UniProtKB/Swiss-Prot annotation:
This is Large ribosomal subunit protein bL12. It comes from Ureaplasma parvum serovar 3 (strain ATCC 700970). Belongs to the bacterial ribosomal protein bL12 family. SUPFAM superfamilies: ClpS-like, Ribosomal protein L7/12, oligomerisation (N-terminal) domain. One of its GO terms (biological process) is translation. Forms part of the ribosomal stalk which helps the ribosome interact with GTP-bound translation factors. Is thus essential for accurate translation. GO terms for cellular component: cytosolic large ribosomal subunit. Homodimer. Part of the ribosomal stalk of the 50S ribosomal subunit. Forms a multimeric L10(L12)X complex, where L10 forms an elongated spine to which 2 to 4 L12 dimers bind in a sequential fashion. Binds GTP-bound translation factors. Keywords: Ribonucleoprotein, Ribosomal protein. Gene3D superfamilies: 3.30.1390.10, Single helix bin. GO terms for molecular function: mRNA binding; structural constituent of ribosome.
Length: 121
């Protein structure tokens, strides 16, 4: 058997049908114990963005129950009456920072019940 050059080998592959190419791939896999499947690189896989474990609670709108919102802000933060009132009257006020997501969702639910809107950032 004479040795094929690379050019001859490529020319022979170009002339094969899809079925013949499939048979060739299977024969190579069997002969050499390899797989034609592309290896999956762990680093190349897209990394899913993890949900933040700690968030900041910002007041978007106090709503109509401003007294209830002020009381809730005082309860959550421990602020005095005037500081809590100022926070309730200022849109975008940071109510609490670095809060666990579960706790932040509970606090958000309390604000929602009062008709206020908060944002978890």
């Amino acid at each position: 058997m004479s040795k094929l050059t690379i050019e001859q080998f490529i020319a022979a592959i170009k002339e094969m049908s899809m079925l013949e190419l499939n048979d060739l791939v299977k024969a190579i896999e069997t002969e050499f114990g390899v797989s034609a499947a592309a290896p999956v690189a762990a680093a190349a896989a897209p990394v899913a963005a993890e949900a933040p474990t700690e968030v900041t609670i910002k007041l978007v709108e106090a709503g109509t129950n401003k007294v209830g919102v002020i009381k809730l802000i005082r309860e959550i933060t421990g602020l005095g009456l005037m500081e809590a009132k100022t926070a309730a009257e200022t849109a975008g006020s940071v109510i609490k920072e670095d809060v666990k997501t579960e706790e932040a969702n509970e606090i958000k639910k309390k604000f929602d019940e009062l008709g206020a809107k908060v944002q978890l950032v």
